[in-house]
Amino acid sequence: LYNWTSGGLFLRRAASGEQIDSLRLVENTNSSGQSAEELIRNEKCTAALDDSGTPTSLQSVSYSDTTWSLLFNCNSIFASTELRQALASAAVSAVEVPDGGLFAEAKGLIPDGLTVDGIDYRQAAGDVRPALGDPRSLYIAARDGGVSPADFGRISLLLPSGSGLSDAAEQINSAWQKEFSLFFSVEEVEPEEFQKRLESGDYTIALAPVQAEGGSVY
């Protein structure tokens, strides 16, 4: 960040070949409901954020720094690998990508559209989602390994409020009910409380964001 004024935010970086080394970000207050494509074509701005998911003839770059994932607290009944895999496998088969264009199906923890030394990471790494296997068979293996129905008391699926994933959480929970006859509650809390509970281990299952951090390949 180089400077900020009423005229916008000014960003700079070291010059490198033909790459852009300076940028001004301006809030558009006169868009009149125009799409990102219309803003670029009609107002001649260089780039605009697009959350519609609508195909366009303009060049686009997909961007995300967050992948939503199921986290299981292993200091609980979910110490069983087979049980975690059973629930994860059922969830993958059941959940639908939320509408609105803000979400896309994840192909791994690291989002699409990221490059490392100029190489497209996803294209180079491929689809790294594990092949978990049949959820019912995994659940039976967990039961054979000592998991008891009596151990499933007071389990909830925790997620932060305002995430836009309430329906997805309900879909996942319904799949667990249908596949395993397991009845968990869905618990939404404020983001601050959600983070505190994750850090303290005060959860059994969480639908949590894995986000970019400094020093990562993100």
Residue locations for each model-derived region?
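A bilobed periplasmic-binding-protein/Venus flytrap-type ligand-binding module shared by bacterial periplasmic
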Residues: 12-14, 29, 61-86, 90, ...
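Sec-exported extracytoplasmic/periplasmic mature domains
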Residues: 41, 45, 77, 83, ...
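Ligand/substrate-recognition segments at binding pockets and active sites
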Residues: 6, 16, 140-212
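Structural transition elements
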Residues: 89, 101-144, 163-166
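Stable alpha-helical elements in mature extracytoplasmic
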Residues: 32-36, 79, 83-96, 106, ...
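Ligand-site clamp/hinge motif
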Residues: 7, 12-55
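Pocket-flanking alpha-helical
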Residues: 34-39, 52-58, 192-218
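Short, solvent-exposed loop/beta-turn-alpha elements that line the ligand-binding surface or hinge
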Residues: 1-3, 56-65, 70-81, 116-134, ...
